[in-house]
Amino acid sequence: MTLRLAYGTNGLTDLRLDDALFLLADLGYDGVALTLDHMHLDPMAPDLSDRVGRLARTLRTLELSVTIETGARYILDARRKHGPSLLDPDPEGRAARVRMLMRAVQIAADLGAHAVHCFSGVLPDGVDPDSAWKWLTDELSIVLYTATGLGMPLAVEPEPGHLLATLADFHHLRHLLGRPDALGLTLDIGHCQCLERASPADCVRSAAPWVRHVQIEDMRRGIHEHLPFGAGEIDFPPVLDALADLTHDGYPGLISVELPRHSHAGPSLAKSSLHYLRGLEKGAHA
């Protein structure tokens, strides 16, 4: 079964959104991982509803599927990367992040997206882990209530350096929340290479029941740097075999190339990344 491949708009920030979408469709991508940010779809825009409506029509015309990502660096605070997070010591800061995530869930529902991606945030200085986990579960419970009502999976990403950094941390969160159906996983293949004890392919297989979104790129062990394919250490043929099994077993979402620091070469990397992944697929089927 052919993988449904996408490219992240956080790697195409020098392009207008329509230009990025037409590029991906022309190249042959199946979808887009759309990061809500000021240069593409600003979730704080006063005319957000009109923008979402226009975007929905464009996606239908181009036959592109979509997943919504919420990892914009400065969308809520121009001075703090990814701040305020769900772990902010200030309750108003946490509430601002919750409001943004709830808006993302509504946008995703309006666009017919597969899932909404999110993450925990970095443990702030002076905050003990127990308090941080309580804040995380309390705030995500609010978002999950909205997501459940709209039938939209909330796909939490284990992120190196964050409170929720590993697959084990994801399962800890599931336990704390009572294993809600709406809570899923964003599985980043590079992060598996960076942090997990198991191989990336084994991570795909072990996490399969909870995967709602997949990000893919190359990476080196112990170094959190998203790299173009071939520039890191990942053995990709077994990973694609595992992803093919995931898709065959009913995963409906996208597998999205994630190169957020390469927008300067975004169009060429979108082309070469698709060529690389489709080439591996063809080799596996030969």
Label each region the model flagged.
Residues 1-6, 13-30, 60, 106, ...:
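Histidine-acidic metal/acid-base catalytic patches
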Residues 8-12, 37-39, 71-73, 121-123, ...:
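Active-site beta-loop-alpha junctions enriched in small/polar residues
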Residues 34, 67-70, 113-120, 154-157, ...:
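Short beta-strand segments at enzyme active-site cores
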Residues 1-109, 209, 271-286:
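N-terminal pre-domain/capping segments
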Residues 18-19, 61, 75-184:
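Active-site acidic/histidine proton-transfer and metal-coordination neighborhood
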Residues 43-54, 85-99, 127-138, 161-165, ...:
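Alpha-helix N-cap and loop-to-helix initiation/capping positions
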Residues 2-3, 11, 37-38, 87, ...:
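Generic signal for short, ordered secondary-structure residues
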